[in-house]
Amino acid sequence: AASLGFSSVIVDDGWQTEDNQRGYAFCGDWEPSKVKFPDFPGHVKRVQEMGLKYIMWFSVPYIGKKSRIWESFQDKLLYYDGFQQAGVLDLRYPEVREYLKRIYKRAVNEWKIDGLKLDFIDEFYLRKESPFFEEGMDCADIQEALNRLLTETMTELTAIRPDCMIEFRQRYIGPQIRKYGNLLRVSDCPGAGISNRIGTVDLRLLSGETAVHSDMLMWHKEERAEEAALQIESSLFSTVQISVDLSTLTERMRKLLIFWITFMKEKAKLLQESQLQPAEPENLYPEVAADNEGERLLVHYSGKRAVDLRQIPKQMTYIHGTKAEEVIFRTPKG
């Protein structure tokens, strides 16, 4: 991955268990599987020595019925989800918040990971079966308790590691979420380049200087490189996450990834830091541009759109992010 230009690896659900069934029955202990990772700190170190940062997924709310810690917290739940075989922890209990913070601090302190992907925080809300304020709680409002957890987590993790990355995804993203993390990702949309485009542009417009990531791009190993390129082009104004088996890449796909990753790094200031100029949100942003210090980058995501060359800066890059075979240019007279 590092040789292709990637800088980080995100380890998703599954590192904590050998079980491959749906649900979260084994969440809660947050111990790396000894079968998969006999020496987890050593594994993290080896990955980092390859030049990659290491980010781990954690499901914040779920505590599984098959976890060892279940007995300690089964009476401190907002509700139990039979389908997921897991309960949603009630953050109004201070010992619940402290337990979660210890887990995250241990991951940074002992395992030396570079960041955390904190998932499913939108599950923290009251249901009909949720308890009212009870003895032992120090917050009446679950949202206030969540605010305490996330604020303290950010403060304590960055005290250990100032550059610690904390990711949240789009379904529960708003301006306030920026104080809890520093990496905002588009909500799940596998194989949907248009959804990734809408999500990344929306987040860029709302997230200030906070880093915006695409949802993971994926494709079949026999997919045409041109189809994969369209997915990447749809997420150009974000940090692109790729989820494919790199060992199965064809040479053409490998060259494709190297080209676009190199391009995005070379144009990082223009793509990531410039003020976006997206057009026609009612049409799903078919045109997006960015300008910076005499340079302009324009992407068209639908056909029959004109590239205006009558007033251009010193340098202009045009990207044809559509299957349309024609490109229309408007040039100065003469």
Residues of each region from the PLM?
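Glycine-rich, aromatic-flanked loop segments that form ligand/cofactor-binding clefts
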Residues: 6-13, 35-84, 163-168, 173
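Active-site-proximal substrate-binding groove within the catalytic cores of carbohydrate-active enzymes
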Residues: 149-334
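Flexible loop residues that form catalytic
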Residues: 14, 121, 240
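Catalytic domains of carbohydrate-active enzymes, especially glycoside hydrolases
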Residues: 1-18, 110-114
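Active-site and adjacent substrate-binding regions of carbohydrate-active enzymes
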Residues: 47, 96-156, 164-179, 236
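Aromatic- and acidic-residue-enriched carbohydrate-binding clefts of CAZyme catalytic domains
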Residues: 15-43, 67-94, 123-147, 153
